[in-house]
Regions:
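N-terminal interaction/assembly modules
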Residues: 1-86, 125, 129, 133-142
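A general structural-boundary detector
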Residues: 82-83, 96, 114
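Short amphipathic alpha helix immediately N-terminal
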Residues: 88-104
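Short alpha-helical "recognition helix" segments of helix-turn-helix
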Residues: 108-113
Length: 142
């Protein structure tokens, strides 16, 4: 994976994290509609699928899995932010931040910096050569 591809993970991880939170919220709302079983003397099947305890156990398992996936996405985002922070100059840092964290197009980055797109692309190339990749979970010991 190139450094550029590594930095591009940020926006994907951010989108995936938002999707995961939406899935958890949708499941929470669905579970809010689960009702307790009313027991009566009437015969009924013994299908445990409708048992409230089983439903909540499945919900907890679902949420735990989603939270693991969510935390993984956050770790990727954190690692990319730390990687960008290894840029040797403030200008390189700012260009990488605008492009990969804020997701701006090259023309918008150039406008924000007040330089030409070609100049920004040149500085970006140098920044990619000089940054150090920080893997998720790695402590930043620069």
């Amino acid at each position: 994976m190139t450094k550029k591809e590594y930095l591009q993970q940020y926006r994907r991880a951010q989108l995936e994290a938002q999707i995961i939170l939406g899935e958890i919220e949708a499941e929470r709302q669905r579970m809010a509609g689960v009702r307790a079983i009313i027991y009566s003397d009437m015969p009924r099947s013994h299908d445990t699928e409708h048992d409230l305890a089983d439903a909540y156990a499945k919900y907890e398992h679902f949420v735990a899995n989603k939270l693991r996936a969510y935390n993984h996405r956050l770790a990727i985002m954190d690692a990319v932010e730390k990687t960008i922070a290894t840029a040797p100059t403030r200008l390189q840092y700012q260009i990488l931040q605008l492009r990969y964290i804020e997701g701006l197009k090259w023309d918008d980055v150039a406008e924000r910096i007040g330089k030409t797109r070609q100049w920004v692309n040149t500085v970006h190339g140098k920044a990619l050569q000089q940054i150090r990749i920080i893997e998720p979970g790695e402590t930043d010991t620069v």
